[in-house]
Structures are given as C-alpha cells and as structure tokens.
Regions:
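Short beta-strand segments
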Residues: 87, 160-161, 188-192, 296-301
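Structural signal for hydrophobic packing residues in well-ordered secondary-structure cores
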Residues: 45-49, 53, 73-81, 101-105, ...
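Residue-level preference for the first positions of well-ordered beta-strands
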Residues: 156-158, 186-188, 290-294
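Cofactor-binding active-site loop characterized by glycine-rich and histidine/acidic residues
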Residues: 59-181
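Short, positively charged and aromatic/hydrophobic N-terminal segments
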Residues: 1-12
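Long, well-ordered, tryptophan-enriched scaffold segments
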Residues: 195-316
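A short alpha/beta connector and helix-capping loop motif
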Residues: 168-192, 205-214, 308
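N-terminal amphipathic, basic-rich helices that act as targeting or association modules
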Residues: 15-99, 256-262, 266-278, 287, ...
Length: 316
C-alpha cells in the first residue's frame, strides 16, 4: 500500500482535469462513448487515481495496472447484471470510479469514506466482498452455477485474478471444479498477469493461434462438428482428443488450463483497450456450449506513473 508523497502531492487543492470522466457516472454512460475514446478515458482515470492516492494513500500500482481492463469489462459486459469479481480487490479503483464512486475516491480508506476493496454493501456493482487472495474464481463459479439453476443462462460471471493469486490452493480447486462444467455456465476467468509468474509464451505461433481460435468462424465450425458427431460416439471421442492435442501442441501456455479442460485464449496486451474490447466482445458473443473460458492478459503494475513502474512493490 502506498502512503507516501508523490509528484502530484504539491497540487493539493487542484484535481486533474477529467473532461470525459466527469460525464461517466455509471457503466451505461461509458458505453455511450465510441470505443476510440476509451484510451482518453484511461489517461484521465490514471491521473485521477494518482491525484487521489497522493492525498489519501492506498493501492496505487495495482490499480494503475488494471485501468484498461476495468474499462473494457464494463464497456463490453452488462454490469451489474453480469457479475464482476475482483480477486483481492486492491486493483479495483478504476472499477469504483466507473461505477458511480468517482467523487468518493477522494476519501478512499478514510473515515466514512470508500472502502479500499469491493464491498457488496457499498455498490451493486461489487458482486463479492474481497480482500483475501485466490477467492474470485470460486465466488464467480458459484454465482454462475446459481444463475444457471435459476434459468439466467445469458448472464456472464467474470473473475479477475492475478498470476500470484492463481498459485493459491483455493484458486486451483476452483479451476479443477470449473472444468467439470461443459455448458450452461457462463464463466470468464481473466488472468491478470503482471509479474511473469507464469512462463511466457513460446514462439510466434502461440500468438497466431490466439488470433485464430478467438474468431467466431473457428467456434462455429467447432460446434457444427460437435453437433454432427454427437450421435456417433466413437468419432466424437476421437475428434475431442484430436482437438485437445492440437491446441496443446500449438499453444504451450494453455497446457496448464487444458489440464483442467478450460478454454484458453491469449496472452493479449492488457493496456490496448481497443484490443481488449474486441477480444472480450468476441468471447461474449461465442455461440454454442463451450464451458468456462480463461483469457490471459499481460499488464504492467504502476502503468503510467514511472516511479510505480520502476518500484511496484513500494507503490503497491
């Protein structure tokens, strides 16, 4: 947690100009903007977070690293009906700003001010109260199963988890459980990889495959093949084995998740907000049964504030 002075602290009574940000009081307002404006909104959010945290202290580098991710998720998904769960929650300042708590961030972690973490009693957009790591996938999966049982099969449930938190036992148990659901459960796991804890992808072919399998034609052909072969058990099982081995061969980083029988995409640039919107839209609009999805996103802690980028631990 950052609690010391920063370069912005000298302007104690002058908040950064946030022309676009002042027009956004909810994700519905955000969705009215053309996607090309989201980069400008990201810059304004970063300046605003730095300004606020320079006065109050708080989780700086974590929140700066997830600005584009928060923007893209609220832009693409129908929050709060679609459920968004932030693991730990210390990276959720942009999320709070976009969900009607912009002014409240000036008193984050202060007496009678905003919590430093998502809280269900603070906003309907905070689907799950967090602060401990490795809990998000379990929470989102539980919500997804409940929604399915209640007939809300179009509702998405998104867990945003870091590479460090993914090493927790509870996260591993949730991944293992999620792999049992092949259809009817709309679960998207965002792996926010900001510290290279997971081995980097091998070769350019991996990136090419990510582009290939994230296109609608790929999944339409995949689901068409399943529908044709489902009444021929021998051929259906053979096709499943061929598909799984092909993906594992071409995309080494996905092997961790294919072990759990999850659909892996990525890695992609977590600071390219237009690219994030494009990818999330494709995943949201995929047709047919496919089970839980993992999207691997690469980000930089402290993005946009050089001292925090160089020393993300101190400015955490």
């Amino acid at each position: 947690t950052f609690s010391g002075p920063c370069a912005y602290h000298d302007r104690a009574d002058e908040m950064t100009e946030t022309t676009l940000l002042q027009t956004i009081d909810s994700p519905a307002d955000l969705r009215k903007l053309p996607v090309e404006k989201l980069s400008d909104v990201a810059r304004e959010i970063r300046s605003y977070i730095i300004e606020c945290v320079s006065h109050t202290g708080g989780h700086l580098s974590s929140s700066l690293g997830s600005v584009e991710l928060a923007l893209a998720l609220h832009y693409v998904f129908n929050t709060p009906d679609d459920r968004l769960v932030w693991d730990v929650g210390h990276q959720a300042y942009a999320h709070k700003i976009l969900t009607g708590r912009r002014e409240g961030l000036k008193r984050v972690r202060q007496y009678k001010g905003l919590s430093g973490f998502p809280r269900r009693d603070e906003s309907e957009y905070d689907a799950f109260g967090t602060a401990h790591s490795s809990t998000s996938i379990s929470a989102a999966l539980g919500m997804a199963v409940a929604s399915h049982l209640e007939g809300h099969d179009k509702r998405w449930h998104i867990a945003v988890i870091g590479d460090g938190a993914l090493t927790g036992g509870m996260a591993s148990e949730a991944l293992n459980h999620a792999g049992d659901y092949k259809e009817g459960v709309r679960l998207l796991i965002i792996l926010n990889d900001n510290n290279c804890s997971i081995s980097p992808p091998v070769g350019a072919l991996c990136g090419h495959l990510g582009k290939l399998v994230s296109t609608s034609p790929f999944w339409k052909m995949r689901n068409l093949g399943k529908s044709i072969l489902k009444n021929t058990p021998t051929l259906h099982e053979l096709a499943k084995r061929v598909e799984k081995q092909t993906v594992n061969f071409l995309s080494p980083p996905s092997s961790i998740f294919s072990t759990y029988d999850l659909n892996y995409f990525g890695p992609i640039d977590g600071h390219d907000v237009v690219g994030l919107v494009r990818m999330l839209t494709k995943l949201r609009d995929l047709e047919g049964p496919m089970g839980p999805i993992v999207l691997h996103v690469r980000t930089v802690k402290g993005k946009g504030y050089e001292p925090a980028e160089k020393d993300p631990t101190t400015y955490h």
